[in-house]
């Protein structure tokens, strides 16, 4: 069944306003990952370019630390990263700003152990090989789970593999388990069992989330571009939240997500349900961009320091989070309708 797409309506509404943005030409390179989320749909449809009025060079990365490195070098202006690499980068004072929370991770990341590995409970992890991308949200969740279980991380062989490498290592039988996201997660779950996931670890005191960040110099020079990027993202969240029952394996949105990420379309609906995608009101609340996100970054940084992953924790992470662009996006939406 065809229904009007709110994102396409937004693009039409912004068409005239985008002309003024195009007059201020900007080189825009955006780094994305393979996480399953609604923003992949407007990315596939070219709606970000249409709303902004600029060409975007989209670059795919395997992990947050890779995105951080590209942001630091100036190769990217915008990037999608998790809370753990965000905390690591901002603790080192990388000049970036988180302008939208793109996902609150629940079951979308999980620790899966191989069938036949002999792992039936947390105590069985000792001596086993568990893979995860280092300094990622999954790595943070893995360490948080081990802490909760009072398991010594040094007794577990934790290896640094990106999601594609995890899937390959799993097929070869080189690893006993992995804490990771999709599409690797969807693949390894077919011959393994979930020992815990990010939702449960979050309840134990180590929540994880994902954000879109911008280089501060780019955001200061082109705030309207960042705001329009936020607007398209927020509308994709609203579209999914309002019609999630229609996002089935054979639906067009799910097929687009699968094509961009390499995930099996049959896995996508469940993986989408494994995260929360906050809309504007939630973004601006005290729980997220209104203060909670900065506090969560600080908490993550404290944990990373305990694990000797960062040298020091800043006294205040609020300079690295801004609600301004979501507010501007709200004004653009209202003003152009």
Predicted regions and their residues:
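Bacterial N-terminal signal peptides that target proteins for export
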Residues: 2-11
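Short, solvent-exposed loop/beta-turn-alpha elements that line the ligand-binding surface or hinge
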Residues: 46-53, 200-204, 280-291
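Short, glycine-/small- and polar/acidic-enriched structural segments
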Residues: 26-152, 157-160, 176-182, 198
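Secondary-structure end/capping motifs
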Residues: 220-309
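Extracytoplasmic/secreted envelope proteins and their assembly/folding machinery
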Residues: 45, 68, 72, 83, ...
């Amino acid at each position: 069944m065809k229904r009007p797409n709110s994102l396409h309506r937004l693009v039409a509404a912004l068409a005239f306003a985008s002309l003024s943005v195009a007059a201020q030409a900007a080189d825009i390179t955006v780094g994305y990952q393979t996480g399953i989320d609604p923003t992949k749909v407007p990315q596939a449809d070219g709606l970000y370019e249409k709303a902004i009025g600029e060409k975007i060079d989209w670059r795919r990365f395997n992990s947050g630390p890779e995105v951080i490195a590209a942001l630091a070098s100036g190769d990217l202006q915008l990037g999608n990263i998790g809370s753990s690499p965000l905390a690591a980068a901002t603790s080192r004072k990388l000049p970036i700003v988180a302008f939208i929370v793109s996902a609150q991770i629940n079951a979308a990341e999980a620790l899966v152990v191989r069938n036949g590995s002999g792992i039936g409970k947390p105590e069985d992890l000792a001596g086993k090989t568990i893979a995860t991308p280092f300094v990622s949200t999954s790595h943070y969740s893995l360490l948080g789970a081990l802490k909760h279980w009072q398991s010594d991380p040094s007794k577990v062989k934790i290896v640094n593999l990106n999601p594609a490498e995890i899937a390959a290592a799993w097929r070869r039988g080189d690893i006993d388990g992995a804490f990771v996201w999709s599409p690797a997660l969807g693949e390894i779950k077919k011959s393994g069992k979930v020992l815990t996931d990010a939702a449960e670890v979050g309840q134990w005191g180590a929540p994880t989330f994902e954000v879109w960040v911008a280089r501060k110099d780019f955001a200061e020079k082109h705030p309207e571009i960042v705001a329009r990027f936020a607007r398209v993202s927020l509308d994709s969240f609203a579209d999914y939240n309002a019609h999630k029952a229609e996002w089935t394996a054979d639906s067009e949105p799910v097929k687009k997500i699968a094509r961009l990420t390499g995930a099996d379309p049959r896995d996508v609906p469940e993986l989408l349900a494994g995260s929360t995608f906050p809309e504007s009101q939630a973004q601006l609340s005290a729980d997220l961009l209104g203060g909670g996100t900065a506090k969560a970054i600080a908490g993550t940084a404290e944990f990373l320091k305990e694990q000797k992953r960062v040298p020091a924790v800043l006294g205040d992470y609020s300079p690295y989070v801004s609600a301004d662009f979501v507010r501007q996006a709200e004004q653009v939406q209202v003003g152009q309708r």
